[in-house]
Design a protein with these regions (language model features):
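Hydrophobic alpha-helical segments within soluble ligand-binding/sensing domains
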Residues: 39, 82, 138-164, 178, ...
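Hinge/cleft segment of the Venus flytrap/periplasmic-binding protein
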Residues: 26, 35-37, 167, 171-175, ...
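Short beta-strand elements in bilobed, periplasmic/extracellular small-molecule ligand-binding domains
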Residues: 65-76, 163-166, 187-206
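Short, low-complexity disordered leader/linker segments with a strong preference
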Residues: 1-38, 112-117, 321, 325-335
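Short, solvent-exposed amphipathic alpha-helices that sit
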Residues: 50-67, 146-150, 174-193, 208, ...
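Extracytoplasmic "Venus flytrap"
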Residues: 36-88, 94, 100-104, 167-178, ...
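Flexible loop/hinge segments that line or gate small-molecule binding clefts
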Residues: 105-145, 163, 261-270
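Hydrophobic alpha-helical
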Residues: 91-116, 183, 198-267
């Protein structure tokens, strides 16, 4: 682990929970022999972030008619609207229901309805707070480990004090809960001080994140770390720093950390404009499709392999192979 930390990249190993989820089970291969597999996808809106844009596109590309699917995707950040969409897909007689939940709670009834109807439920991106027997399998990011990776990086900077601004994502989402937990645990252990605790709201808004930092500056808060739970919010936070003339990045006063691995964010890290970015891979569709078509399911919750990169470890290959969305180009800073 120490060796990996020195180069700034930590592989978050793919893990399987000890609780079996239909171990060795078989998934149906379609509504009828030789027909298209009917799939309902409940997801968040692509406007939420660069991560979500890539995730929505991945789902659309994989679950296409060309690949043997009759799929529809609903995109909303409202949990009640997501639940209503899931209920609609069940009534429509889908074979499989894929869910990335806006909020981790409130899903028991619809999941139990899916089970009674014989609909296979696959979670992606985020876990739901429910009994594992209520879904078939899951392929998700380990948000808690992402948060621990980020906080270990912060603590490893050997700052004389750590006064941190925490900018959370959508409150109650699996991503927010996991990533925030590490910062809150470090605070409770007396390792850091959280001088401002805000959120980008349900849309993980750049503008709302900027307001959190602007308010901290106006209030005279002394801070030296921005812990923003996605790249867009990190961008908004840095806009506030720039407007106030506060230095940041590799040689600046304030360390800036984001999540998701958008290529613009990685180029900012490479340029020393930001300090660190944590990967959260949006590409789950291909693996779930393999599960469905093969009929062979994993024995539990599968966590994706993910990495992080800082100014000491970032390379063009990392940006090319792991980054999301358009690449602004080497040396280009996105403000």
């Amino acid at each position: 682990m120490k060796k990996i930390a020195k180069i700034g990249i930590l592989a978050l190993l793919a893990m399987v929970t000890l609780t079996p989820v239909f171990a060795g089970g078989k998934a149906d291969s379609g509504s009828k022999k030789g027909g298209l597999i009917k799939v309902g996808i409940v997801n968040l809106p692509p406007e939420e972030s660069g991560y979500r844009q890539a995730n929505v596109e991945d789902m659309n590309n994989v679950f296409s008619k060309a690949n043997g699917y009759d799929a529809k995707q609903t995109n909303t950040g409202d949990n009640s609207e997501q639940i209503a969409a899931a209920q609609g897909y069940i009534r429509d007689g889908v074979d499989c229901l894929l869910i990335s939940a806006a909020n981790a709670s409130g899903w028991d009834n619809v999941l139990q309805s899916a089970k009674k109807a014989g609909v296979k439920v696959f979670l992606f991106d985020r876990l739901i707070d429910t009994d594992p027997s209520n879904y078939q399998a899951a392929l998700v990011s380990d948000m808690k480990t992402e948060g621990n990776t980020a906080m270990n990086w912060v603590l490893g900077q050997k700052l004389s004090k750590i006064n941190l601004i925490l900018i959370r994502g959508q409150l109650g989402s699996a991503a927010e809960l996991g990533r925030s937990a590490a910062a809150l645990a470090a605070k409770d252990a007396g390792k850091i001080t959280i001088v401002a605790d805000g959120t980008g709201g349900d849309s993980w808004s750049l503008e709302e994140a900027r307001k959190v930092v602007e308010a901290a500056i106006v209030a005279g808060k002394d801070f030296n770390v921005i812990y923003a739970e996605n790249d867009g919010m990190a961008q908004g936070a840095v806009q506030a720093l720039d407007a106030a003339g506060i230095t940041h990045g590799k040689n600046g006063k304030v360390k800036v950390l984001g999540f998701d691995f958008n290529r613009f964010a990685l180029r900012n890290v490479q340029a020393g404009y930001w300090d660190c970015d944590i990967q959260c891979s949006p590409r789950q569709a291909g693996e779930i499709s393999k599960w469905i078509k093969s009929g062979t399911l994993p024995s539990g919750i599968v966590f994706q392999k993910e990495i992080f990169a800082d100014t000491a470890s970032i390379t063009d290959d990392i940006i090319k192979n792991f980054g999301l969305n358009d690449d602004p180009g080497k040396g280009v800073i996105t403000k």
